A protein has these predicted regions:
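Small-residue-biased structural context
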Residues: 2-180
Length: 180
């Protein structure tokens, strides 16, 4: 009985502290966090398609490497803003824990592959294969986020417009750090 009360109190407390949705008209005027993240997904998918064309045409190693590094940077920044801002907000709003746990494990796998790619020369064996597999990891991750996690986040009491602002600000900071 005491644990049931604690559990109920914990859920009530989490719901009180979770950022609330603004009015529908205010939401429409601003970008939603899931839309911002989906734009990142579309941008990186486009880069992977460009990389595939370069690899298929046996393009110069430097050109492939430059594009691979751009992909790695974009994914690193994207994963960071999700892990620092979006996932904690989703956890606070009590979005399905298993989805969030799996997303973080997928990020860890992608980061490992990113580190391998960044440490390689484009002329090394398996370079193109590693970039391709990274793209496959990302496709899987994106499908789960966009088809499962994001709809649940939209139904949860999350301030997606406020999160979008925080995500965009942090993304700008990280991109500036990378450029420096």
């Amino acid at each position: 009985m005491a644990t049931a009360k604690k559990s109920t109190a914990k859920k009530a407390s989490a719901k009180k502290t979770a950022a609330k949705k603004p009015a529908a008209s205010a939401r429409a005027a601003k970008t939603d966090a899931t839309v911002l993240l989906q734009r990142d997904h579309a941008d990186v998918k486009k880069l992977f398609r460009q990389y595939e064309k370069l690899a298929d045409n046996e393009a110069d190693g430097q050109e492939r490497q430059a594009l691979a590094m751009q992909i790695c940077q974009m994914l690193t920044v994207h994963a960071t803003i999700e892990e620092e801002i979006f996932y904690p907000a989703a956890r606070e709003a009590e979005v399905e824990e298993d989805l969030l746990d799996e997303a973080e494990v997928e990020h860890a796998s992608a980061k490992d592959l990113i580190a391998q790619i960044q440490a390689m020369s484009p002329d090394e064996e398996l370079y193109d294969a590693k970039v391709t597999v990274l793209g496959e990891y990302v496709d899987h991750h994106v499908q789960e986020e966009e088809n499962e996690m994001f709809p649940k986040c939209r139904r949860a009491e999350m301030d997606l417009a406020g999160l979008a602002e925080r995500l965009a600000e942090r993304k700008s900071e990280l991109m500036a750090e990378e450029a420096a």
